[in-house]
Design a protein with these regions (language model features):
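Short glycine-rich phosphate-binding loop at a beta-alpha junction
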Residues: 93-102, 287-297
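Glycine-rich nucleotide/cofactor/substrate-binding loop typically near the N-terminus or early
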Residues: 22-80, 85
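Short beta-strand-loop/turn "lid" adjacent to the catalytic site in phosphate-handling enzymes
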Residues: 58-121
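Glycine-rich phosphate-binding loop and adjoining helix at the ATP-binding site
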Residues: 96-153
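Glycine-rich phosphate-binding loop plus the immediately following alpha-helix
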Residues: 16-23, 33-50, 127, 133-161, ...
């Protein structure tokens, strides 16, 4: 069993999720602790501003000085996060053997065969004096994979930990939503569509950043879904394409919805997330007995209640319902687990999860000298 820290900075750019787990990288896991370190407002703004500038791969070179500056700052914030988590642990922190460092995605495009995360794994290792695994997506993409999603093999571990019956599905509603379907030895995973990103973006635009997200789905409940705009979004070829498949937050344009009032825009994008998830179920045979919701979107009552109403034959639950699981830290826990698998040379991506040519051990490993 190896004790590892996982670090995740998601599409919301709000801060660093950090988790400590102990695992053998295969079947056993102990959840030790979690910690969230928020970004300062100015840094968050600069990070989001950079992401908005990068719409194509050529923009990486164009904005390289800005990227390098932010990468160093982001790495130092991750260092501070680990130090604070170590302090929280006290003497137990000496048992930490490995750090899984995802970094911050600034560009993801399967078409370009590129997925760029900023975060200096070598600097992180040097400053923390810890073994570090980073660059988790690179090897998968270079071998024909989508580079996403990466959490399915961790969902498989959770299924065993929670002793669920087959078939079961985990749906993570982050910036982008993705699904992992498990049935005996079968594992299938793909992005379903937008999660919170479009909802958050239109709220931030229309409120000039006074409101960051739809707390409990309150805005969506007050609005009316524009069915014509919704159907236009759902007509995108992505939704009829067979998995595996992945998305980036820039794959959907929000211009069509800018003319709507705030509540209607939020209701329309929230329903878009719901309908995209429902369409993803068409690729699952047989249907899962249970769907487990993870990620920030599980807290959105509008999305949760709409899914429960429209998907009547499947039990839908939030992962927090189950023993000692905190749904806010699934991805950070996953990257701790993926780091351990990488260290032990066990595959983290598969043809059925990313479309890679073969099961692959991913991630660059930096060992302390």
């Amino acid at each position: 069993m190896i004790t590892a820290i996982g670090l995740m900075s998601g599409t919301s750019c709000d801060g660093v999720d950090a988790s400590i787990i102990k695992t053998d990288g295969v079947k056993k896991v102990e959840f030790i602790d979690n910690y969230y370190h928020p970004y300062e407002k100015k840094f968050r703004f600069r990070l989001k501003e950079l992401k908005e500038k990068i719409n194509q791969f050529s923009d990486i070179k164009k904005y390289r000085p800005d990227i390098d500056t932010l990468e160093r700052e982001l790495t130092l914030i991750h260092v501070k996060t680990v130090e604070l988590l170590r302090k929280k642990l006290g003497s137990e922190n000496k048992k930490i053997e490995l750090v899984g460092f995802h970094g911050q995605t600034i560009f993801h495009s399967f078409k370009d065969k590129k997925s760029i995360q900023i975060g200096d794994g070598k600097l992180l290792s040097q400053l923390l004096n810890q073994n570090v695994v980073y660059n988790f997506r690179k090897k998968d993409i270079s071998n024909g994979g989508q580079g996403a999603p990466l959490t399915p093999v961790f969902h498989q571990l959770l299924k065993n930990y929670l002793d669920f019956d087959f078939p079961v599905a985990f749906i993570n509603i982050g910036g982008i939503a993705n699904i992992t379907y498990l049935n005996n030895q079968k594992i299938l995973s793909f992005d379903t569509g937008p999660g919170n990103f479009l909802i958050d973006s239109i709220i931030q635009i229309k409120t000039k950043n006074e409101i960051q997200f739809d707390n409990n789905g309150d805005l969506a409940f007050k609005g009316t879904v524009d069915k014509n705009i919704l159907e236009t979004y759902l007509d995108d070829p992505f939704f009829s394409k067979s998995p595996p498949k992945s998305l980036d937050v820039n794959d959907f344009n929000i211009s069509a919805i800018r003319t709507l009032k705030l509540e209607d825009a939020v209701a329309t994008f929230s329903e878009f997330t719901v309908q995209a998830i429902i369409r993803s179920l068409n690729f699952l045979d047989p249907l899962p007995k249970k769907i487990i919701l993870c990620g920030g979107g599980r807290k959105n009552k509008f999305i949760f209640e709409r899914l429960q109403k429209l998907v009547k034959k499947i039990e839908i639950q939030k992962i927090d319902k189950y023993k000692n699981i905190d749904g806010d830290f699934i991805e950070s826990q996953a990257f701790a687990y993926l780091a351990v698998r990488t260290l032990k040379k066990i595959p983290i991506t598969f043809p059925e999860t990313t479309g890679a040519a073969e099961p692959l051990v991913g991630g660059d490993l930096v060992l302390v000298k």
